[in-house]
Amino acid sequence: MRVALGVAYNGQRYSGWQSQLSGNTIQDHLEAALGRFAAQEVHTLCAGRTDAGVHGLMQVVHFDTPLDRAPFSWVRGTNTFLPPDIAVQWAQPVPDAFHSRACATARRYAYVLLQSPVRPSVEAGRVGWVFHALDGDAMQAAARHLLGEHDFSSFRASGCQAKSPVKTLHRLSITRRMAGDGAQMAAASSMRPGDAAMECCYWRFEFEGSAFLHHMVRNIMGCLIAIGQGTYAPQWMQQVLDARSRDAAAPTFSPDGLYFLGPVYDPSWGLPSRSPAYDWLP
């Protein structure tokens, strides 16, 4: 039978999703736990690979097994053997025609960014950070240049293995949430005389696209932040896109605040569409 799993993880301690000789990847730990629970070797295929330091709220994998076990048994049994920062959220038997990657019609990511004169501490590794205030309107205007089908070569890592740089970005939303009074007081007390006042807040960038190139979201983030800080005008994003050269774009931004929200499937597969942890993001 074929089984699909929804997996959530904090990627800080791991070398990304895909199995490596080091054994310190999410896939390595998941397959080891599944193997111990099933008492046999288990090989998984995922909806979308994530890089070192990137988190996953609902990575979807599938595997084939001769064992017929209840969904709750796969969840609880596998989690028994997983480290505390990786957990199976749900399990569901699926038809043999289901493929976690090939059946996905889109993929979704979120980037959570802290704007504050004080670097994150408790949230270290879970949010990106900028010291300077960002212009939301400028970033919104820049983001509109990226919507639709484009050649995203300018936002592609040199080691990207995708067959084509042409992808479709369906949605890029940018929202802001103010931090609490304590954060505002801390921000004010850390400013030097003469510094411009800055509100402490969280920016949330959500991406939905047909598929994503290696480092594509982080490279777009680098450009959006450069525009938000006033280094470039919003129209610069179109110039970067048209250049089709990685050299034209801003540096790759930190992986810390990047979350793979999960794939999008046709409702007929009957799989959960969103992780409960989605509502916990700032």
Swiss-Prot record:
Active site residues of this protein: 51
EC top class, as a word: isomerase
GO biological process, alphabetically ordered: tRNA pseudouridine synthesis
tRNA processing among keywords: yes
Signal peptide (residue range): none
Keywords, comma-separated and alphabetical: Isomerase, tRNA processing
The protein's assembly and partners: Homodimer.
PANTHER family listed in its UniProt record: PSEUDOURIDYLATE SYNTHASE, TRNA PSEUDOURIDINE SYNTHASE-LIKE 1
Cross-referenced HAMAP family: TruA
The protein's role, per its UniProt record: Formation of pseudouridine at positions 38, 39 and 40 in the anticodon stem and loop of transfer RNAs.
Name of protein: tRNA pseudouridine synthase A
Gene: truA
